[in-house]
Structure formats: C-alpha cells, structure tokens
C-alpha cells in the first residue's frame, strides 16, 4: 500500500434508528487516508448504506437516529457546526437509490444546485457542468427532466452532481447496480481514471466486484450483525479468506470463482486467466422451453410524445420458462414491463394472456394471474409492516398466514416482520417485493432487476426461488444487467436495442454467435464466453501470422 495522509477517522461508531433497537452497525473503527481507495463489503442489511450516510454527516440528523462513537474529517468531528456546513464540499455520497438525492427538475439545474451552494460564479459553474457531463458521456441529458430518465441514467446524473463539486472523499453506494453491463464496466474504469487524475479518496459499497477488486487495494468487510469482520489487502482477503467471505454472503469475483472451479492458480486478473487453455465441457447446453404459450405480444409499440421508446415488438412467453430481458440503459425495458402489466397503455399492438386481450380482464383477476415486481420496490409498498405487506389483498386465514411466514423465513425477513417496509435496507426491500408477488399463484411473473441490492447468498436464494416458481409452470420475464445470471438461469433472452427487439433466442446463441450485437447493445460476455472469445482471437491472429 502507498503512504497517505489521514483524511477520515472512524472510532467505535455505532448507529441505530430507534433507542430500543439493536444497532444497525456497531463498534466500527478504521482510518481512510488521502487518495486511498477502499471497498466496503457485507451482507445485505448489515448497515453499509447507513454507515456511508454517517460518514458524511447526513445521519443521524436526517433520520433522528442514535449514534455513538466519532467520525473525524480532517481531524474535525463531522458533527461540528463549522464542519457540517461545508461537509458536502469535502465528502460526497452517491446514494443507492439516486431519486433520494434529487431536488430539482432538470439535469442541468440539479448539478447547478450543489455548485450554487458553494457560491461558484455562474460562468465557472457552466464550465464545470459541461465538463462533468462530457466526462460521464451524458451531455445529451443536460436539459432533460430527471423524472423521464432511466434508473441507470439517474445514477450517472447523481455522480455528476458529486464530481462537479470536486470533494476530497467520494462514497459510492452500489453505483453500478442500475447500469447496463458495458456502462458498468465503463463507469468503473472511469472512476479509476478520475481517482488517479484527481487524487480523491474513494469508498465503494458494492456487491458486484469483478471490475473493482483488481485495482482497489484495501477491503473492509462487515458481518451480518454490522461489526467489522475483516480489514486488509483485497488480494489477500479473496485468496485466503474466500470461505469466510462466502459464508457472509459476499460475491467472490467471477474470475476467482472460475479458477477455483477449474483448480487453477489464484489471480484477480482475468487477463492472466485467459492465458490458460479452457478445460473441455464447461459450456452446458439447455433445452429450449416447450410449454404452451401463456403471453403473446404482437407488434407492440410505445411512445412518449413524439419519441418512440420501442416499436413493433413481438415475442411470446411459455409456461415453465425464464426469459431474460436485456439491453442498454434507457431503451425502455422497465417501460415494456409496465405495458405488459397493463400499468401503461401501448400506442399500438396486442397483448394476449391465455389468448384473451389484457383489457378484457378485470383488474383483480389480472393481478391474480400476473405479478409485477417494480425496479424501485418502494413503489409497491402500501402497509406499515413487512408482514402486513405479504398479507395485503389476501384472505386472512391459517393457510395464507402460513405461506407468509414461510416466505419471510425463505427470504431472510422473519426478524423484520414488524418493521416498516420503508425502514429496511434496499436489499431487504427487494426481497420483500419479490416475496409479495409469490403470495399469489401467478401464471406470469414480471421482475424488474430482482437481484438488485442483494448479496451473493440472498441473490442465489432469490434465483432458486424463481426457478422453483418456473418449475411449477409460471412464465417468468426478468430484466437484468447480470449476464452471468442470464447464462446460468435463463432459457431464452430478449435484447432491446435501438427501439426494437434485436434478438430472441438462447443465451448460448447470443453469447457465442452474436458477439457484435452484445457489443452494440452494451452488454458484456459472461466470463467463460469472454475467455472463449479471447482464445479464438489468439488463434485467428496466429493463423494470420503463419500466413
């Protein structure tokens, strides 16, 4: 590790939302130096996001929480009046849910808001706004209404707001979770370049570690109770503490997982892995789904004003199948799900559920047959407790209560049964939103990023639950940015690109035969397919050289 000067000091920090509750996290102590980059890992619900908000002084004041211990920024307590007034200039947080930090209508005004608070002159402000938009490649969003942006675009805007103020410390809370795979990789490389150029300190909370782990030297790990479990060099932790990390529900970088599976030497570098020959028999073929068609979509189009979001889309969902819906940010994937769920009206086209148009179904009947999990789970919560959320709209009897208890246990939410749905972590909210849909025996299940915000263990449990639902005959359509998940679980893939449906086929066909489309649609190849493509390029180069 390099030698740094002290920037942030955390001493025996604990935090809880209510006086009689056990702490969300407890007894956390560490130092963060100027220019240092650190990964903050831990299972879903262990207090990572709450810790981030304590570090820049938003908590406990913003939530009437209870905090003990100390946080020092430049050796001054962040709770000091003088420090708290200027802290956003020194320590910026990009929230897990970007909507929570926006207060203006347009992108330009949102970035300007923070700069105005720093009393930046107007001419300089305009230069800073244009520079940061160009740096993040979102200049085309400058005059857009924030409410019209996709989740991934909002996340980039939130980062732009922080970068424009040039803080000494940037805290990123799952910054790539809403980005398409190409944009996520691009984002990480951008942060790497920016950090080296500007020299700011960086604290990253993340579940997807493949792009971060090779260059962020230090990692801090929290356990389920919110205590610090590990703190050390990233390479050492993944090499020597992999089993401990897995037990905590932390996703091991895919390169580590693959080399362990293939009994190969340890490395965090996929470039090193790709130099080795691929063992035979590691790409398994799947049978095409053979169930009857449940949902038929024909020539479906949707527009906002004069702007076409998607047009002339046709596909079908079959009983007992899992279809992945993928594509770049802003292509209308979430909008398509809303149209399929009859929450938005299409401009043209037909949607048939069991050969009957959606509009022929009564609302209550449609909801019993079709479940929809929103990208933002808070949009579907209507009760005051986690338990009541599961029972909402159900007949109160022993059978439904038993099913609710089973789902609480299955999704690791039993200890939160009496909590308000808005007071649990983002990962827990996501699990609750999926669980509520499983209270109904739906025939079609629409899922918008079901594993978003989940640690490795709960994401795997969520997918296994979806697999069981699929095995019972339900047709599942799932938006995801995780191509490894697509490769492992999906029976078929739909690729939305350039307002149309660019691909409808198997994952193996997409990743092995349509690599040009993978690149155009801002996807990434699963690691094994990327390895295969790399070795094919090497063979082609060798052939050209030999001639």
From Swiss-Prot:
Q: Provide the protein name.
A: Putative HMP/thiamine import ATP-binding protein YkoD
Which EC numbers characterise this protein's activity in its record? 7.6.2.-
- Which parts of the sequence bind ATP 1? 42-49
The text of the family note is: Belongs to the ABC transporter superfamily.
Keywords from UniProt, A to Z, are: ATP-binding, Cell membrane, Membrane, Nucleotide-binding, Repeat, Translocase, Transport
SMART domains, per the entry: AAA (SM00382)
Q: Which organism is it from?
A: Bacillus subtilis (strain 168)
What's this chain's function? Part of the ABC transporter complex YkoCDEF that could transport hydroxymethylpyrimidine (HMP) and/or thiamine. Could also transport other HMP-containing products. Responsible for energy coupling to the transport system.
Keyword Cell membrane appears in the UniProt entry:
yes
Where does it live in the cell? Cell membrane
GO terms under cellular component: ATP-binding cassette (ABC) transporter complex
Q: Molecular function (GO) terms listed?
A: ATP binding; ATP hydrolysis activity; ATPase-coupled transmembrane transporter activity
Report domain ABC transporter positions.
8-250, 295-523
- Keyword Translocase listed: yes
Locate the residues binding ATP 2. Answer: 327-334
Against CDD domains, the record matches this protein to: ABC_cobalt_CbiO_domain1
What membrane topology does the annotation report for this chain? Peripheral membrane protein
The UniProt subunit note reads as follows: The complex is composed of two ATP-binding proteins (YkoD), two transmembrane proteins (YkoC and YkoE) and a solute-binding protein (YkoF).
Q: Gene that codes for this?
A: ykoD
InterPro entries per the UniProt record, alphabetical: AAA+_ATPase (IPR003593), ABC_transporter-like_ATP-bd (IPR003439), ABC_transporter-like_CS (IPR017871), ABC_transpr_CbiO/EcfA_su (IPR015856), ECF_ABC_transporter_ATP-bd (IPR050095), P-loop_NTPase (IPR027417)
């Amino acid at each position: 590790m390099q030698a740094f000067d002290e920037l942030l000091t955390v001493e025996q920090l604990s935090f809880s939302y209510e006086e009689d509750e056990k702490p969300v996290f407890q007894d956390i102590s560490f130092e963060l130096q100027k220019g240092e980059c650190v990964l903050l890992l831990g299972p879903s619900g262990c207090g990572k996001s709450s810790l981030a908000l304590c570090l820049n002084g938003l908590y406990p004041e913003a939530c009437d929480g209870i905090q003990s211990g100390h946080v020092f920024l430049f050796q001054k307590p962040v709770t000091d009046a003088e420090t708290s007034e200027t802290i956003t200039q020194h320590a910026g947080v990009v929230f897990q849910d970007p909507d929570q930090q926006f207060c203006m209508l347009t992108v330009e005004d949102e970035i300007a808001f923070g700069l105005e608070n720093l009393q930046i002159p107007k001419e300089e402000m305009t230069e800073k706004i244009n520079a940061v938009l160009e740096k993040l490649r979102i200049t085309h969003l400058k005059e857009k209404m924030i409410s019209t942006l996709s989740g991934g675009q909002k996340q980039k805007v939130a980062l732009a707001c922080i970068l424009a103020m040039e803080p000494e410390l940037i805290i990123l809370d799952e910054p790539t979770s809403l980005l398409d795979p190409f944009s996520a990789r691009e984002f990480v490389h951008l942060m790497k370049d920016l950090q080296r150029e500007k020299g700011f300190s960086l604290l990253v909370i993340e579940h997807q570690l493949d792009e971060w782990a090779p260059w962020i030297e230090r990692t801090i790990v929290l356990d389920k109770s919110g205590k610090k479990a590990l703190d050390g060099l990233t390479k050492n932790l993944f090499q020597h503490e992999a089993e401990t990390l897995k037990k905590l529900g932390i996703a091991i970088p895919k390169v580590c997982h693959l080399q362990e599976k293939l009994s190969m030497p340890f490395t965090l570098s996929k470039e090193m892995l790709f130099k080795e020959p691929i063992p035979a028999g590691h790409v398994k073929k799947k049978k095409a789904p053979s169930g009857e068609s449940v949902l038929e979509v024909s020539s479906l189009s949707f527009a906002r004003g004069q702007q076409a979001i998607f047009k002339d889309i046709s596909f079908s969902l079959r009983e007992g199948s899992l279809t992945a819906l993928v594509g770049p940010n802003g292509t209308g994937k979430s909008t398509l799900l809303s149209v399929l769920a009859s929450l938005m009206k299409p401009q043209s086209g037909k949607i048939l559920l069991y050969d009957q148009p959606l509009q022929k179904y009564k609302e209550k009947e449609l909801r019993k047959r079709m479940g929809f999990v929103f990208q933002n789970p808070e949009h579907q919560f209507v009760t005051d407790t986690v338990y009541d959320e599961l029972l909402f709209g159900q007949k109160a009897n022993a059978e439904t209560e038993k099913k609710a208890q089973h789902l609480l246990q299955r999704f690791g939410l039993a200890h939160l049964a009496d909590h308000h749905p808005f007071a649990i972590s983002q990962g827990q909210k996501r699990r609750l939103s999926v669980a509520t849909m499983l209270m109904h025996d739906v025939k079609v299940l629409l899922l918008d990023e079901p594993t978003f915000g989940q640690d490795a263990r709960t994401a795997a449990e969520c997918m296994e639950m979806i697999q069981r639902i699929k095995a019972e005959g339900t047709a599942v359509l799932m938006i995801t940015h995780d191509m490894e998940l697509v490769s492992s679980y999906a029976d078929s893939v739909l690729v939305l690109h350039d307002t149309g449906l660019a691909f409808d086929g198997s994952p193996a066909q997409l990743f092995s035969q349509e690599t040009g489309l993978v690149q155009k649609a801002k996807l990434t190849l699963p690691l094994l397919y990327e390895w295969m493509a790399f070795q094919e390029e090497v063979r082609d180069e060798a052939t050209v050289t030999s001639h």
